Amino acid sequence: AISTGGSPAATIVGGSGTLGLAGLVFSRGLTGSWWLLVGPVGLFGLLFFLKNLKSRSVYTLPELIGGWYGPIMGKVSGLLVLIAWLGIVGAQTAAAGRILSTQFGGQMRYWTLAAGSVFVAYTMSGGQVSVIRTDLLQALLITFGLGLCAVVGLQLSGGFAGLSAGLPPRYFAFPVSPDFSGSDLALMLLVVGSTYLVGPDMLSRVFSTRSEGSARRAVLISICVIIPVAGFVTLAGMSARILYPEIAAEAALPMLVKQALPSWLGSLTTIALLSAFLSSADTTLLTMSAILTVDFLGKRDSERLLVPRLSVLGCGAAAVLVGIFSGGIIPSLLLGYSVFAGGLFVPILAALLGKPLRSSSALAAAVLGGLCALAGKLSGRDLLVAGSFAVGAAVFAADRVIFLLERRRS
């Protein structure tokens, strides 16, 4: 349970939970920390569904959805996850490329390619069990390295008094601010928080635990790790704003590591950060490989390792291209999260609550919600992203009305 507890924690605190979060805090202050703090909110909700999830003998989220809604819905959900999760792996490779280029110079795209190649090779060399075992060490490295970075950065920026004097008051507003309204928080809880509750990478960790008790302890350990890490990265982001106000937001943490820390400490923190990116990338690649292997190719025999490893290679190559040509860590992740959550959150939650939709209704909610969220992100209109959840809720309400009418007639 201890190993599996470190595993989802290390998975969550990847490129978005470090460089991405530091960049958000650098840009708007304390409210940027919600990017990671919505994680414990979603994980707390997951605790209530562990018994239901552990009672099902499945390997992947699309397989679970297919059991509820039929094979067509399982395939559609698998396709949505594959498309969305390319952005997540791509973001990890981009984050690794940024910190390596900051540390050692050179073009970021080449470092992104190199890091992505290492991530893919690492994932291909082992399976879910191998990743779970190493993720515990990675979680400890992440927490230790980020804690050191936060302490040194805070000292160099003059302590809490220096932050208060050097940053505008809006940077200390919480839970909302002039740059981050209540509606922004609600949308982040829906789009990002829901992936912690029903996301395929988190659920793959649940499916990998031996029992409901092990899964519960793993989730609780993850919550206890994520909250202090969010605090460390927040302090680092605000300190970087004082020390290096002219740099790009997502360069805040790499610059702090390079300029503020002694060389030995900077190297240790760089290793911790790269381990965070590796943790997120390997879990996501394994999730995508399992979906391709089990849900699309029907290969469940654990002895046939060639197909899963080739799936990791193919997904990894595509994700590296996304990382090289993406516009940033947070934007690419939000695109993926929005498509996934907008299409699948309502059907999954309804089934977990014991009120599943009819198969045709679930398919309509997934397709319409996913398309609405995709249109919203591509057009830059958050109202459409929020509307994807409204579409899912409307389909659910209509389905329940039809169900009740049919039952009354019978």
Predicted features by range, described:
Residues 1-410:
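Membrane-embedded helix-loop-helix hairpins and adjacent transmembrane boundary segments
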